[in-house]
Structure formats: C-alpha cells, structure tokens
C-alpha cells in the first residue's frame, strides 16, 4: 500500500465556539457552535472543511470528530460520511484528548495511518492555494515519521490569540525545522515574534499515527492506555459507557500548549502561500473577513442580502448577524 493510500483526514469539529456566541444565537436564544454556521450565506464551515479534506484524502478516509451534545447539528451535516468515520467525543476535555481519540480510532483500522488534521472553523479565500500546501503536507509525512508537520501562515498583524511558529533551517523536502513554538503569547511577545518573521500556526497539521501516539503518551500518561482499553471492541460491547466514564475523569489538556509547544525539535513547518486564510475565532475576525470578501467581490452584494440572518438551508449567517449587531449598536 502506498503512502497516499494510508493518509487519513480528520476535521476537528467538537468545539463549543464560545468566543463567537454573540453571533451564533438561534431563534430560541441558544448558541450554535460556529462550525455549524455559514460565514456569508453558503455552506457551513464544517461542510467547507470536509470538502477541503477531500481534496487531499479519499472520502473513505475522511473523518470528523464531533461532540455528543451537538448531535442535532452534525447528524445532517455529516450524512455523507461513513458512520464509522464520525468520531463522537462524550464531552470536551481539550484538544489533546480529542486528537488522542481520533488517533486511537484510526489506528485500530489502519496501524500505519498518516493523519492530517483540519479545524472546522477556518475560512480560506483561495482554496486552490491552500490545497497545494495540503498536498505538500501529505507528501512530507514520509520525511518526518517521528514528528509533527505544521502548516504556517505569514501573519498580517500580531495577534495574541493565535499560536506562532519560528522557522529554522530549510530541509531537503522543502519544509523547515522549528526553532520555537509559542501558543497564544502575550501581546508584546506576539509583536516581537512577528518582527522575527514567525508564522501563525494554522492548526492544520499532520503526522503518522504512531508518532502522534508516542508524543501524546509523553504528555497524557496513563490516559492513553485507559482510552485504548475503553475503545477496544470487547470492552465497547461489554460496557458501552466505558469511554464516557473515562471522560468524566479526564482533565482538560490543550494540544498546542501541552504537546506541540513542548517538542519543537520534533516539528516541521510548511509555509502556505497567500490564500486569504482566517481562523474565525472572534467577531473581529468575522468582520475583517467579510470586509475583504465585499471589497474583492466583482459585483457588490446588496445590503439587504448581507443582512439575512439565515441561509436558505436554515444555517446561521455569521456575516449577517455581525452586520445586524453593528447596526443595532
């Protein structure tokens, strides 16, 4: 089996999106996680991420991790995925445990899997440009079998709410070593990192399943074996609640801070070309992205259309919600 055939894609879609809750209220006043919303009236961010993954991995190896409590949102959105490719997290215990759940689930099916992770809350203006980096990432995993390869983005400005990658020397495959990784630094440190040509961490990354498992074991300890036991077929059949019971005991652990930041020597980075990438984590970033879209549109969108709070498929329109709140304020 060749390397491409063993590459899996996982869309990270289990977050609550609390920082964007002001824009994601449904008619009942409940906050809908942003990945189940549309940026500007089209498909949901989750559906966009699934399509992004399918440009680099086969549909049969495209997975998503979701939260059990969001089932009413993701059941319809993920109807095109095989049921076994929907990895359900009992509750949120941080991205490190979410990544671990994905790795163990995939390695059970493919012990030599290479896995690419893509967040479900990104907007990309030029998808074809990012696809080049995703293909490069998939290829690079053969050259970094024991570490993690990240996709970095040249920053527009200092932003303390993102992670930063300080690249090192260039390697034979075109990727670069990582001299330093800093997750969500203080504002003065973010300023300094941008001056030093650091890259934003897109949180799009890839690694072999065994390499990820080894790094996670160093930081999560016995939780790795406990989760592997809970996921074993015979345990699932005898005690379906075993995984949920384990999650009740797990602490919340952030993958970027507790795993990626701790092992810079095991990291590689690929710099994405200019592609209009945005992490839609805050209302400010939503507003900036919508402004760019309006400026670059060949035909201006009528204001009445931009203010429609729901898409034709019943999704919350983040751009419209932001515009309405701005007018109300």
Task: Locate the predicted segments by residue.
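Hydrophobic packing residues within well-ordered alpha-helices of enzyme cores
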Residues: 20, 74-75, 190, 212, ...
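A short acidic, often aromatic-flanked loop/helix-cap motif at beta-alpha or helix-coil junctions
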Residues: 44, 92-97, 157-159, 187-188, ...
């Amino acid at each position: 089996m060749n390397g491409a055939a063993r590459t899996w894609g996982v869309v990270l879609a289990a977050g609550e999106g609390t920082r964007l809750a002001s824009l994601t209220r449904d008619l009942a006043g409940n906050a809908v996680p942003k990945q189940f919303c549309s940026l500007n009236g089209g498909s949901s961010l989750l559906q966009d991420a699934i399509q992004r993954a399918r440009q680099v991995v086969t549909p049969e190896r495209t997975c998503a991790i979701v939260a059990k409590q969001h089932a009413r949102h993701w059941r319809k959105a993920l109807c095109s995925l095989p049921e076994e490719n929907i990895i359900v997290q009992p509750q949120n215990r941080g991205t490190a445990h979410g990544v671990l759940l994905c790795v163990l689930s995939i390695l059970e099916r493919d012990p030599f899997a290479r896995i690419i992770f893509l967040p479900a809350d990104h907007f990309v203006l030029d998808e074809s440009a990012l696809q080049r980096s995703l293909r490069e990432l998939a290829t690079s995993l053969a050259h970094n079998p024991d570490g993690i390869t990240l996709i970095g983005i040249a920053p527009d400005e200092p932003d303390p709410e993102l992670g930063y990658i300080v690249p090192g020397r260039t390697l034979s495959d075109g990727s670069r070593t990582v001299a330093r990784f800093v997750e969500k630094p203080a504002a003065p440190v973010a300023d300094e990192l941008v001056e030093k040509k650091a890259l934003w961490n897109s949180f799009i990354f890839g690694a072999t399943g065994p390499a990820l498992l080894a790094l996670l074991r160093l930081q999560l300890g016995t939780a790795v074996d406990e989760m592997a036991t809970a996921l074993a077929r015979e345990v699932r059949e005898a005690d379906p609640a075993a995984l949920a019971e384990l999650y009740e005991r797990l602490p919340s652990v952030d993958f970027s801070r507790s795993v990626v930041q701790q092992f810079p020597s095991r990291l590689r980075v690929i710099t994405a070309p200019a592609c209009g990438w945005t992490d839609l984590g805050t209302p400010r970033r939503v507003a900036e992205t919508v402004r760019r879209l309006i400026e670059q549109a060949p035909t201006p969108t009528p204001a009445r259309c931009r203010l429609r709070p729901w898409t034709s498929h019943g999704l919350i329109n983040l751009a419209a919600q932001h515009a309405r709140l701005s007018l109300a304020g």
